């Protein structure tokens, strides 16, 4: 199958005993095939299920009646929302629905509406407005008619939620690229060029038609008291396209034109021809402006050209912020005058702003307490939870940004800055620093910073477990302008002054670890938590050596709120310390404050094991337990034939145990009872606890040994195995820092082991060298991030851009200017700088910055960079990594990293990217000059010649860590569908998959990262079920949602584009497929650079697609490019290279280069012979081809004759199986027509079904695989 990007379902799949092909193929990019045959196409395309039927909606205005298909599983408010969004019913926003004269409650399910069935009639009844409804109606109408423009949002950055999907394949004028009759979309692709940043932005868009010049709240707003009593709600002023100004009254009955003007106030209805009234403002504007209706229709048509998902606002997720954005003068980011923009906060939340003040904690906890027995209850509960977390994350981040900028007064202004706390919008804020000395012995500020990050992960873990009656506070961590800020919902009673003798905490450590509380009501709750997280029940001792038995870590607190609920707090220590790392690299701070030795100066003691590692070690212990049990049973069976039983384990075990085999002669299988197995780790060992009794000491020693064994498992098993799998191509090779850290985390490997992995990767193998280069780049980016944060933290916001630009110049621009200058405005500096501002960044030089970053890498990752530094040619990739980590949004232009490019780049217009792929540069410059308006800034100041300027840093956005739980219901449905498909229950599987899709969309909303992953996974599964139309549609959606929620150049977005290309090709749209493949490859160059180890398969796919288009010469070029990378990655004498040589020889033959074909085939034959031996069938196949091609080269006439008979054959590029020639297959090429210039009766591009061709493209061999297994080229594997 093509790909599976749903991480959760991947881990669930790993824990299931599924052995069929669908579930075993974790490939992300490659191998769309028909492994699971499916002939039934009902299910998705058959009759509608019983709970879905059509009804009629009766309207008060034209068209008076519309049909609508509904599902009884939906709520009435879902139907209401659908009516609001339909083109014929745009104008309605304040209404209710009636059925048979009875009003329907908006908050019930449609299934609860009495007598509602097929062909029922629901009536839309317009309601009187109140002030809130009027405000929301005005907002909605402004958005509908395109008058709202772009909001300047403090949280969302420039072009947040951008999608390129609709503009891929368009040139800079916004029109499809002309390839010419003989060219393909890949015609001018340059394999070796660096990434072109123009591929990260859409071409300039044609402006949308204007329906109205402006509409805003009037200066006469709000209505005076005596008019409010008469039903006046708002006063508006509108300027039509005919330049007529109208003052409008918003009344409880609707909207009408009044007699007011800018100078006089008279809100009574106007007389004469303009005496107009309508319930909807949209209808009133249509009546007022003769051109409105036509313009509005044009606007709808303009918007209809775009995929709806690209323009919907994100409501349940924070949109991705691009790191490269257009300059302020670009047509993509024009800033238009709009008075209503300043009024939006009033329109959204009213005069008192009470609409937005929410009791977050009560909302979180009451949602948790909702019923979850029935499926519809679970759907409603999870849907509300998802929306609530999204709203909270949004509000908490906005508040954190205000705290970072110093715009909120602290509750304790006399305290030190790091100890200050804030409350804003019912959210409690504090700094991720050790302001009160809590972590004095653990590493101070560094320890506190790590602890709050781990706390978010802990809160998310507890939220996912969903333990009844155990509650958590809403938690968000925001990194902004160098500061780390924690936002938490306020737990009732947390600030309460306790009586003497009462403790602030009811379970766990109080005031350090001197006092330990152990309220018994927490025991059953923490017991469930600890069992799920493999935390061992253990004793701890307070300052008086009194023994307390705790279910969790002493650091994990329990608090009984004044609302009577039990809260779990401080969840940063759910796993044990990584004692091996701490003993090697940490030493306790000395009382004399002497400097620590360099080998023991790790910045903090909060180095814990990851939960994934604890789980993986637990599975290892289970395997050992089962093996011992099997051995015991085998020893008991003396005198009889030795049995090799198969262990039947629960889903908990997940994987086949080593040595399991079916009992040959036994009618029943032996079972291993694992109820006696238990595994848990004590999180408080090595944390200063001193056992008192001998019994406790012995138990404690055992616990310590177990934790040491887990640490040893990480260093001796997990990390080396991961490196081996990367070397052998068993897992997808990471593209960037994000995909690298994701790969490590899924294996349970902490980021602090980057240095160790780099050392272990320092071997001659090309894949390992590529891994080492990527890790070094990531360490530099992270080291720079830590240093940059330390400088940004103490700089006022107006100087942050100058600070960042100077730091970037020192990091990346040293070759262009060895002595960069910080561009701080001295006059502003004199006027507003305070003693707290630290301008030491101005004194930094490239040498001093390099020294600081190298020191950070040595400190945090225990790695000596030596002579290594930023790799030449990879400056753009490092700039991207740094920008994403710091939340930078840079102006799009060609940044010169050397003196030559800096000089040449000066002439390039800012909106345009430099020319790379072989087109005329001059034409593009001209186009950009005509499209982009000239700079309207103040006269240019003479700036020093350096790579980055302060003006290039257009914005800094927050980097957010949040604790939203996943939907268990949607995950369960997806997994059930996957299992059914794997067990060959195709119809049931398809039904479950589509149900899972519906659940994902219902619970998360459509625009959400989890939905993107679900679309991706489901598109692959549905393709294998032969539902190609649905698979293709979902593949398109996966791309758009990935772009908008993860980023246009996120690694998952690239894989989604590659998947989409394969599906388009399978559907017969090869040209469109190549456009998407090219875009993915261009993104790949920006993310990683040229020659990514896993791009071999993609280049092969493109080559085969070109052959399908009969572009034989171009196809040959792509095969050769793939071969070149394969030789670099796998070596010139590997079987992978031999197989690609074999394919390239065939491509050369199709291109009529017989001499080249013979040479390539001879190389292939020699490698097969040397590696596999003369008798291997692959060697014989190559030998047969070599003879045939040699004869053809000797006799041109014989060659043409052979080609005319269609004897040239092609082999599969295998994915899981080795890359080798296979046994003879039917002719699939039009070789005869290519060489002889004519078509024969049977000479078609493909005589097999498209599924078979797709198998060939993707590399899934239809024959029995050879037993010897080799590495890539292969499918891009989902990173486990």
Curated annotation (Swiss-Prot):
Name the GO terms of the biological process aspect: intracellular distribution of mitochondria; mitochondrion organization
GO MF term (any one):
mRNA binding
| Comp. bias (Polar residues) | 1-27
Record field: compositional bias (Basic residues): 635-648, 1265-1280
Listed Acidic residues bias regions: 32-43
Asked if the record carries the keyword Cytoplasm, the reply is yes
Residue ranges for the region (Disordered) are 1-49, 169-189, 633-669, 905-943, 1214-1280
- Domain Clu per the UniProt entry, residue ranges: 338-582
PROSITE patterns noted in UniProt: CLU
Record text on subunit structure and interactions: May associate with the eukaryotic translation initiation factor 3 (eIF-3) complex.
Q: What does this protein do?
A: mRNA-binding protein involved in proper cytoplasmic distribution of mitochondria.
Q: Which family does it belong to?
A: Belongs to the CLU family.
Identify this protein by name: Clustered mitochondria protein homolog
Source organism per entry reads: Phaeosphaeria nodorum (strain SN15 / ATCC MYA-4574 / FGSC 10173) (Glume blotch fungus)
Q: Please name the gene that encodes this protein.
A: CLU1
């Amino acid at each position: 199958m093509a790909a599976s990007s749903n991480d959760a379902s991947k881990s669930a799949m790993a824990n299931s005993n599924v052995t069929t092909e669908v579930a075993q193929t974790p490939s992300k990019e490659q191998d769309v095939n028909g492994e699971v045959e499916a002939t039934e196409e009902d299910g998705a395309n058959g009759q509608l299920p019983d709970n879905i039927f059509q009804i009629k909606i009766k309207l008060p205005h034209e068209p008076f009646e519309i049909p609508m298909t509904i599902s009884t599983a939906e709520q009435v408010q879902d139907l209401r929302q659908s009516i609001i969004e339909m083109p014929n019913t745009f104008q309605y926003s304040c209404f209710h629905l009636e059925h048979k004269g009875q009003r329907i409650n908006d908050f019930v399910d449609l299934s609860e509406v009495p007598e509602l069935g097929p062909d029922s009639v629901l009536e839309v009844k317009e309601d009187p407005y109140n002030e809130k409804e009027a405000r929301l109606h005005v907002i909605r109408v402004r958005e509908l008619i395109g008058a709202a423009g772009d909001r300047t949002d403090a949280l969302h950055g420039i072009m947040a939620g951008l999608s390129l999907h609709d503009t891929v394949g368009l040139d800079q004028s916004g029109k499809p690229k002309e390839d010419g009759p003989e060219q393909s979309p890949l015609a001018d692709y340059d394999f070796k060029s660096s990434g072109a940043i123009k591929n990260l932005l859409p071409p300039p868009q044609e402006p949308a038609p204007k329906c109205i010049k402006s509409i805003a709240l009037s200066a006469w707003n709000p209505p005076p008291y005596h008019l409010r009593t008469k039903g006046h709600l708002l006063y508006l002023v509108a300027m039509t396209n005919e330049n007529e100004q109208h003052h409008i009254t918003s009344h409880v009955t609707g909207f009408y034109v009044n007699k007011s003007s800018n100078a006089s106030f008279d809100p009574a209805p106007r007389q004469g021809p303009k005496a107009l009234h309508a319930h909807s403002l949209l209808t009133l504007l249509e009546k007022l402006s003769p051109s409105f209706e036509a313009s509005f229709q044009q606007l709808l048509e303009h918007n209809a050209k775009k995929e709806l998902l690209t323009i919907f606002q994100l409501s349940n997720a924070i949109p991705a912020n691009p790191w490269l954005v257009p300059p302020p003068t670009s047509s993509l980011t024009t800033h238009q005058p709009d008075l209503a923009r300043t009024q939006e906060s009033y329109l959204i939340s009213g005069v008192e702003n009470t609409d937005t003040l929410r009791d977050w904690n009560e909302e979180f906890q009451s949602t948790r307490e909702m019923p979850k027995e029935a499926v519809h209850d679970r759907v409603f509960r999870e849907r509300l939870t998802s929306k609530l977390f999204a709203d909270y994350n949004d509000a908490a981040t906005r508040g954190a940004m205000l705290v970072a900028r110093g715009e909120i007064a602290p509750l304790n202004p006399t305290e030190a800055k790091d100890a200050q706390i804030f409350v804003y919008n019912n959210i409690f804020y504090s700094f991720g620093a050790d302001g009160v000395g809590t972590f004095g012995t653990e590493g101070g500020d560094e320890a506190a910073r790590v602890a709050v990050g781990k706390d978010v992960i802990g809160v998310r873990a507890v939220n996912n477990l969903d333990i009844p009656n155990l509650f958590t506070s809403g938690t968000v961590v925001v990194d902004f302008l160098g500061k780390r800020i924690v936002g938490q919902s306020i737990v009732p009673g947390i600030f309460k002054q306790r009586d003497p003798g009462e403790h602030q905490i009811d379970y766990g450590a109080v005031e350090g670890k001197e006092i330990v509380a152990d309220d018994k009501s927490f025991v059953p709750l923490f017991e469930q938590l600890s069992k799920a997280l493999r935390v061992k029940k253990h004793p701890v001792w307070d300052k008086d050596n009194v023994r307390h038995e705790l279910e969790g870590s002493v650091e994990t607190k329990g608090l009984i709120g004044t609302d009577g609920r039990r809260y779990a707090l401080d969840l940063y220590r759910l796993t044990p310390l990584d004692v091996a790392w701490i003993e090697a690299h940490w030493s306790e701070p000395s009382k004399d404050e002497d400097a620590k030795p360099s080998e023991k100066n790790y910045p903090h003691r909060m180095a814990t094991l990851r939960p994934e590692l604890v789980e993986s070690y637990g599975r290892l212990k289970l395997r050992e337990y089962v093996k011992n049990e099997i051995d015991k049973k085998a020893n008991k069976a003396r005198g009889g034939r030795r049995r090799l039983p198969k262990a039947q384990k629960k889903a908990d075990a997940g994987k086949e145990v080593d040595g399991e085999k079916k009992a040959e002669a036994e009618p029943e299988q032996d079972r291993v009872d694992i109820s006696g197995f238990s595994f848990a780790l004590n999180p408080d060992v090595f944390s200063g606890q001193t056992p008192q009794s001998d019994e406790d000491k012995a138990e404690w020693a055992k616990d310590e040994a177990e934790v040491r064994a887990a640490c040893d498992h990480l260093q001796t098993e997990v990390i080396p195995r991961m490196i081996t799998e990367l070397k052998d191509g068993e897992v997808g090779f990471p593209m960037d820092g994000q995909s690298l850290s994701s790969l490590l985390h899924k294996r349970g490997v902490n980021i602090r082991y980057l240095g160790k992995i780099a050392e272990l990767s320092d071997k001659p193998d090309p894949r390992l060298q590529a891994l080492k280069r990527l890790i070094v780049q990531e360490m530099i980016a992270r080291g720079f991030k830590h240093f940059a944060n330390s400088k940004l933290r103490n700089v006022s916001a107006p100087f942050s851009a100058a600070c960042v630009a100077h730091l970037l110049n020192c990091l990346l621009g040293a070759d262009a200017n060895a002595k960069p200058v910080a561009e701080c405005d001295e006059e502003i500096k004199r006027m507003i700088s305070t003693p707290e501002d630290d301008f030491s960044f101005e004194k930094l030089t490239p040498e001093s910055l390099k020294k600081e970053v190298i020191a950070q890498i040595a400190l945090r990752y225990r790695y000596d960079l030596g002579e290594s530094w930023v790799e030449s040619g990879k400056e753009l990739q490092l700039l991207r990594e740094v920008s994403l980590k710091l939340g930078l949004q840079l102006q799009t232009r060609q940044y010169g990293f050397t003196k030559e490019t800096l000089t040449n780049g000066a002439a390039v217009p800012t909106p345009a990217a430099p020319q790379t792929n072989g087109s005329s540069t001059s034409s593009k410059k001209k186009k950009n000059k005509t499209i982009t308006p000239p700079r309207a800034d103040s006269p240019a100041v003479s700036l020093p010649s350096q790579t980055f300027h302060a003006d290039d840093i257009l914005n800094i956005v927050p980097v957010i860590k949040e604790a939203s739980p996943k939907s268990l219901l949607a995950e369960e449905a997806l997994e059930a569908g996957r299992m059914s498909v794997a067990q060959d229950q195709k119809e049931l599987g398809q039904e479950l998959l589509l149900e899972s899709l519906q659940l994902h969309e219902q619970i998360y909303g459509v625009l959400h990262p989890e939905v993107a992953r679900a679309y991706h996974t489901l598109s692959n599964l549905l393709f294998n079920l032969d539902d190609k139309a649905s698979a293709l549609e979902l593949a398109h959606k996966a791309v758009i949602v990935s772009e908008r929620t993860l980023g246009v150049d996120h690694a998952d977005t690239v894989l989604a584009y590659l998947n989409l290309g394969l599906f388009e090709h399978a559907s017969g749209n090869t040209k469109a497929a190549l456009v998407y493949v090219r875009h993915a490859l261009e993104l790949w160059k920006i993310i990683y650079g040229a020659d990514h180890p896993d791009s071999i398969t993609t280049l092969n796919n493109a080559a085969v697609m070109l052959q399908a288009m009969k572009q034989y010469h171009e196809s040959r070029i792509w095969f050769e490019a793939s071969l070149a990378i394969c030789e670099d990655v796998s070596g010139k004498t590997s079987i992978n290279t031999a197989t690609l040589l074999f394919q390239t020889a065939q491509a050369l033959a199709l291109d009529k280069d017989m001499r080249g074909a013979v040479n390539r085939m001879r190389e292939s034959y020699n490698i097969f012979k040397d590696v596999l031996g003369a008798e291997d069938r692959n060697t014989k196949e190559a030998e047969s081809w070599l003879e045939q091609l040699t004869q053809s080269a000797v006799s041109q006439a014989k060659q043409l004759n052979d080609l005319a008979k269609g004897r040239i054959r092609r082999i599969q590029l295998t994915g899981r199986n080795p890359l080798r020639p296979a046994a003879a297959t039917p002719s699939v090429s039009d070789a005869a027509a290519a060489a002889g210039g004519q078509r024969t009766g049977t000479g078609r591009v493909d005589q097999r079904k498209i599924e078979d061709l797709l198998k060939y493209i993707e590399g899934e061999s239809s024959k029995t695989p050879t037993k010897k297994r080799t590495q890539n080229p292969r499918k891009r594997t989902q990173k486990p």
